[in-house]
Regions:
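Receiver (REC) domain active-site loop signature in two-component systems and cognate sites
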Residues: 60
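Active-site beta3 strand of CheY-like receiver
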Residues: 49-55
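Charged docking surfaces used in two-component/phosphorelay signaling
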Residues: 20-28
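Conserved acidic carboxylate
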Residues: 13
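Short hydrophobic/Thr-rich beta-strand motif most characteristic of the beta2 strand and flanking loop
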Residues: 30-37, 45
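C-terminal output helix
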Residues: 111-120
Length: 135
């Protein structure tokens, strides 16, 4: 029997309900998910777990996503991990700031899950992933 590698996604989000719902949706889509509640934990988790992709909220306590992304990009062990910024901020200025910090993509909350999964798969070079069933 052939083992299929499961892609690892780190989701960094300070709101517990949003973090839990998104983590569950990603797991139902076939990913292995780890979570962190702020930028400090996110940087530590990324270094320890070596995820295939990071979803990063931008507005968090202790260390915001902008700073966490800059740190991850400056560390050779995490510099090449794709990072998708997720924020309630919809302005072009915040999107530009996230991309300048080193994010590969920027999504505005509420996130369109099917579009997010397509984007994740593009970065992970996976043609398809299970879509969670709507309730």
């Amino acid at each position: 029997m052939e083992l299929i590698a499961v892609s690892k996604i780190l989701y960094v989000e300070d709101h517990p309900a949003q973090r839990d719902i998104m983590a569950q949706m990603l797991e139902l889509s076939g990913y292995s998910v780890a979570v962190a509640s702020d930028g400090v934990e996110g940087v530590d988790q990324a270094r320890a777990w070596n995820p295939d992709l990071i979803l990063m909220d931008l507005r968090m306590p202790r260390m915001d996503g902008f700073e966490a992304i800059k740190i991850l990009r400056s560390d050779p062990s995490t510099a090449d991990i794709p990072i998708i910024a997720i924020s309630a901020w919809a302005s072009a200025k915040h999107k530009e700031r996230a991309l300048e910090a080193g994010a590969d993509e920027h999504f505005t909350k509420p996130v369109d899950l099917s579009r997010l999964i397509e984007t994740i798969n593009r970065y992970l070079k996976q043609p398809e992933s299970k879509q969670p069933e709507s309730s």
